[in-house]
Amino acid sequence: MGLPQEHRLKRRKDFQKVYKQGGRYTSPHLIIRTLFESCSENSLNSQPTCFGISVSQKVSKKAVIRNRIKRLIRQAIRELLPQISNGWKVVIVIRPGSVECKYDRFLRELKQLLIKAEIINGHQREYIL
């Protein structure tokens, strides 16, 4: 089971916008880039939070390993989705050296970064940054 369609960040221009305008939070194995975007007229109907995952060849030359890491990250996102507030665009970048990392470690680091970025347990924003 993959990440629901409405929670996927796919287009190149969306990734670029998050990289240029968003904030950056780091941990030993992950980097997240975040950008808050919401409908200006009604914050109750804001867009769901979208996630993009980037695993470069610096992490591993083998696509099988990169895809396994992406599956682990998607599973961690699915587990955290009920706690995540709406209106965010998040790009998760996997750092080199994460090949040996287990699911529990990814989940713990991702949750800590999302809390730090106020995407989990953060206040609901009613304005556009």
Swiss-Prot record:
Pfam families per UniProt: Ribonuclease_P
Keywords linked to the UniProt accession: Endonuclease, Hydrolase, Nuclease, RNA-binding, tRNA processing
Gene name tied to this protein: rnpA
One CC-aspect GO term: ribonuclease P complex
Coiled coil: none
Role of this protein: RNaseP catalyzes the removal of the 5'-leader sequence from pre-tRNA to produce the mature 5'-terminus. It can also cleave other RNA substrates such as 4.5S RNA. The protein component plays an auxiliary but essential role in vivo by binding to the 5'-leader sequence and broadening the substrate specificity of the ribozyme.
Leading EC class: hydrolase
The keyword Ribosomal protein is annotated on this UniProt entry: no
Annotated GO MF terms: 3'-tRNA processing endoribonuclease activity; ribonuclease P activity; tRNA binding
Swiss-Prot/TrEMBL catalytic activity: Endonucleolytic cleavage of RNA, removing 5'-extranucleotides from tRNA precursor
Record-level GO BP terms: tRNA 5'-leader removal
Protein name: Ribonuclease P protein component
Family statement: Belongs to the RnpA family.
Keyword RNA-binding found: yes
Subunit structure: Consists of a catalytic RNA component (M1 or rnpB) and a protein subunit.
EC number, as in UniProt: 3.1.26.5
